[in-house]
Amino acid sequence: MAAKDQLEVQVMAAQEMELAGKDPVSHEHEERKPVTETKEGDVTDEHGERGSFAETDEHTGVDTKELEDIAADIKEHLAAKRKRIEKIAKACSEIKNRIKNVLRTTQLKRQKRDYRISLKLPNVLEEFITDEQKDEEGDGEKEEQIKIFQEQQKRWQQDGKGTERD
């Protein structure tokens, strides 16, 4: 955990250096403690426990094994996120394809319906026109019948007046 804290401090210091316009890498070498010769048995960590020289960074005293573990955890976490993102992207594309298919199907149904209606429309219009013509003819026949009836009434009235005189 101490190595993680130390790593965070180093990262924050590097970010501050970048903001200040300094090169964090070259500045890092300036801040390091001078290297002293040590033997494998002389290396101890912060808690006084001895570790092998190969597992410890000679400049900072950070346990490289711990850093490698942290890096491995980060890689696992990123791989898991990448898989989740890929799954989400795949699901989105599937949903997008479904929506396209539904829209295409709906559009085809609408076009078929409109086509069938357009085929029926001339027949319906023709029926309407013939019905209107029949109604007009029927109106003309009714008018003729009314005229004939009125003429007959006049004759009857005239006949009735003429018979009364007799």
Swiss-Prot record:
InterPro entries: XLR/SYCP3, XLR/SYCP3/FAM9_dom. Residues 129-142 have a biased composition (Acidic residues). GO terms for biological process: meiotic cell cycle; spermatid development. The lineage of its organism: Eukaryota, Metazoa, Chordata, Craniata, Vertebrata. It is found in: Nucleus. One of its GO terms (cellular component) is synaptonemal complex. Belongs to the XLR/SYCP3 family. Keywords: Nucleus. This is Protein FAM9C. Its main location: nucleus. Expressed exclusively in testis. It comes from the Eukaryota. Residues 19-63, 152-166 have a biased composition (Basic and acidic residues). Residues 17-63, 129-166 are annotated as: Disordered.
